Amino acid sequence: MAEESVSTQFLSNIIGKPVHVKLYSGMLYSGVLESIDGFMNVALSETREHYEHPNNNLLKKYASDVFLRGTQVMYISEA
């Protein structure tokens, strides 16, 4: 049986929890992680959009799910 990598284990453990997703563009999305795949494509619910930092002014709040393309994701952290 192959061991899960630390990053795979981390991502599995935070599904359904609040996260911050930073994009290379500088945008920061905060929401509940609904799903993530091997390409780092991310689906969030209850999402808020900020620029650079969550304490900056809220740019937009989304009522529906938000999908972020994995090639644009710099990092994902637990909120």
Swiss-Prot record:
InterPro entries: Lsm6/sSmF (IPR016487), LSM_dom_sf (IPR010920), Sm (IPR047575), Sm_dom_euk/arc (IPR001163)
Record-level GO BP terms: maturation of SSU-rRNA; mRNA splicing, via spliceosome; tRNA processing
Transmembrane segments: none
Keyword entries, A-Z: Cytoplasm, mRNA processing, mRNA splicing, Nucleus, Ribonucleoprotein, RNA-binding, rRNA processing, Spliceosome, tRNA processing
Sm domain sequence ranges: 6-79
Annotated compartments: Cytoplasm; Nucleus
Disulfide bonds: none
Keyword Cytoplasm: yes
GO molecular function: RNA binding
SMART domains with a match to the protein in the record: Sm (SM00651)
Subunit structure, interactors included: Component of the heptameric LSM1-LSM7 complex, which consists of LSM1, LSM2, LSM3, LSM4, LSM5, LSM6 and LSM7. Component of the heptameric LSM2-LSM8 complex, which consists of LSM2, LSM3, LSM4, LSM5, LSM6, LSM7 and LSM8. The LSm subunits form a seven-membered ring structure with a doughnut shape.
Family: Belongs to the snRNP Sm proteins family. SmF/LSm6 subfamily.
Protein name, UniProt field: U6 snRNA-associated Sm-like protein LSm6
Source species of the chain: Candida glabrata (strain ATCC 2001 / BCRC 20586 / JCM 3761 / NBRC 0622 / NRRL Y-65 / CBS 138) (Yeast)
Taxon lineage: Eukaryota, Fungi, Dikarya, Ascomycota, Saccharomycotina
Recorded name of the encoding gene: LSM6
